[in-house]
């Protein structure tokens, strides 16, 4: 189990999964020898959830669901003829939250909300019974937030109410103990609501929510500047703010946020390598960097200043170069094909306009 945690911390999900499976086999063997050894059964359920999260991290959602199901089956067996302990209730709630999140990634929204609502009910019971346990309150807020994300996607009427309740719980947690994990979660809630407001044409309100998200992300990145997840989320927020300020006609802010997103993309390209594949560069970071260079170029062109035009040309060339690198590795990558063609077309138009 300690080895699995080490692999997880080192960003080696496949190694973490393999190590956890070895532990699971050993614990399952002990549990099968004595079905009344519920302590072993609970340990097995915990490891199943850990494996499920590992598979979710590498986007193998079917395997993730399989191990969450296995955890729930173990818990059903443990509590069949016994009142569930607090630990059992927590594991049940965690399993339902995990399943709800994974089903959401698979666009199975109805099923996702069913599991998330089970988790919300179970965490709510734990919070009511043990209000001093801030961990339970956090996971209740997280389950509500994930439910709100699905509700926003499906246009459910209760989306804003659920999201607001999640934010209320998180604000209470932050006021008592401003931990980074609480601030990161509340930033997610503001970001989700901001995207929904954009889709509804409420750009001013969307900017307000996006700036609240950015405020929290900036605070936690001061404490953990090398945290990959914080960097990825901050970069996507800069991209959203770029689009929002573009609509508002605030060119200065557009360029500022373009540069911020690009800077983080360059950092991620170097720091978030695929440790399990000879420390290779991850394709998603190449793609984002190529897009960010292209968007910076596009927005600089609109300024129509010669200095900015020269920088725009360099940005398009860099975007084109990175897309070409992607296509060397994946010739059939449609996004890269389209991105390369777009950057090439932009360079042609720049050449024509300067002739």
Language-model features: where?
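Structural motif corresponding to the intra-repeat A-B loop/turn of tetratricopeptide repeats
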Residues: 10, 58, 99, 106, ...
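TPR-repeat structural position
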Residues: 13, 20, 61, 68, ...
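Residue register of alpha-helical TPR repeats
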Residues: 39, 43-46, 87, 91-94, ...
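Terminal, low-structured helical/coil segments at or just beyond the last alpha-helical repeat
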Residues: 325-355
């Amino acid at each position: 189990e300690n080895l699995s945690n080490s692999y997880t911390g080192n960003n080696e999900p496949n190694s973490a999964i393999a190590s956890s499976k070895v532990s699971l086999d050993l614990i399952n063997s002990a549990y099968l020898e004595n079905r009344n050894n519920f302590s072993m059964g609970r340990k097995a359920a915990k490891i199943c959830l850990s494996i499920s999260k590992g598979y979710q991290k590498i986007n193998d959602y079917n395997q993730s669901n399989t191990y969450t199901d296995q955890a729930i089956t173990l818990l059903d067996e443990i509590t069949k003829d016994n009142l569930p302990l607090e630990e059992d209730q927590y594991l049940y709630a965690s399993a339902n939250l995990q399943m709800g999140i994974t089903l959401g990634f698979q666009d199975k929204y109805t099923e996702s909300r069913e599991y998330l609502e089970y988790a919300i009910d179970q965490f709510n019971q734990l919070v009511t019974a043990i209000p001093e346990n801030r961990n339970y309150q956090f996971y209740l807020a997280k389950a509500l937030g994930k439910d709100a994300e699905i509700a926003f996607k499906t246009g459910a009427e209760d989306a804003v109410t659920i999201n607001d309740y999640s934010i209320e719980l998180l604000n209470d947690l932050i006021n008592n103990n401003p931990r980074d994990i609480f601030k990161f979660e509340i930033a997610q809630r503001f970001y989700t609501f901001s995207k929904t407001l954009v889709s509804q044409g409420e750009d001013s309100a969307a900017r307000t929510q996006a700036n609240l998200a950015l405020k929290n992300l900036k605070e936690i990145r001061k404490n953990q500047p090398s945290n990959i997840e914080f960097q990825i989320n901050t970069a996507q927020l800069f991209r959203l703010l770029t689009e929002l300020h573009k609509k508002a006609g605030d060119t200065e802010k557009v360029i500022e946020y373009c540069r911020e997103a690009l800077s983080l993309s360059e950092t991620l390209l170097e720091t978030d390598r695929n440790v399990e594949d000879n420390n290779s560069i991850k394709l998603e970071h190449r793609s984002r960097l190529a897009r960010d260079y292209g968007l910076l170029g596009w927005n600089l062109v609109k300024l129509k200043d010669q200095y900015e035009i020269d920088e725009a040309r360099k940005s398009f060339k860099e975007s084109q170069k990175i897309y070409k690198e992607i296509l060397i590795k994946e010739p059939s990558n449609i996004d890269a094909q389209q991105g390369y063609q777009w950057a090439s077309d932009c360079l042609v138009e720049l050449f024509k306009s300067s002739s």
